[in-house]
């Protein structure tokens, strides 16, 4: 058994690409239907009024309007889109 690891071997040098998750549109911003509001793992922010949920828990606007973030209960946050009138 060699007690040194051969000349050119390296065990490091790998890195995965960033997932680009997080809030994409903040409160008070205008959105169009279909715009992505939040990319997330699991439902840490829930879908409120006029907001849909994708297969990967992505939240998106169902109507044109203005984004608001509000507390659903003491522990759960939700995002809603209200039509601009």
UniProtKB/Swiss-Prot annotation:
The keyword Lyase is annotated on this UniProt entry: no
Domain of life assignment: Bacteria
One GO-annotated biological process of the protein: translation
Any single GO CC term annotated in Swiss-Prot or TrEMBL for this entry: ribonucleoprotein complex
Region called Disordered, residue ranges: 1-22
GO MF entry, a single one: structural constituent of ribosome
Gene3D superfamilies linked to this entry: 2.40.50.100
Stored InterPro entries: Ribosomal_bL27 (IPR001684)
Keywords: Ribonucleoprotein, Ribosomal protein
Family membership: Belongs to the bacterial ribosomal protein bL27 family.
Record PANTHER family: LARGE RIBOSOMAL SUBUNIT PROTEIN BL27M (PTHR15893:SF0), RIBOSOMAL PROTEIN L27 (PTHR15893)
Protein name, entry field: Large ribosomal subunit protein bL27
UniProt source species: Sorangium cellulosum (strain So ce56)
């Amino acid at each position: 058994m060699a007690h040194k690891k051969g000349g050119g071997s390296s065990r490091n040098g790998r890195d995965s690409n960033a997932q680009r998750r997080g809030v994409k549109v903040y409160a008070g911003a205008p959105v169009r239907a279909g715009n992505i509001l939040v990319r997330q793992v699991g439902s840490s922010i829930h879908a409120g009024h006029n907001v849909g949920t994708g297969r990967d828990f992505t939240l998106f606007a169902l109507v044109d309007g203005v984004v608001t973030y509000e507390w659903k209960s003491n522990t759960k946050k939700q995002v809603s889109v209200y039509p601009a009138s």
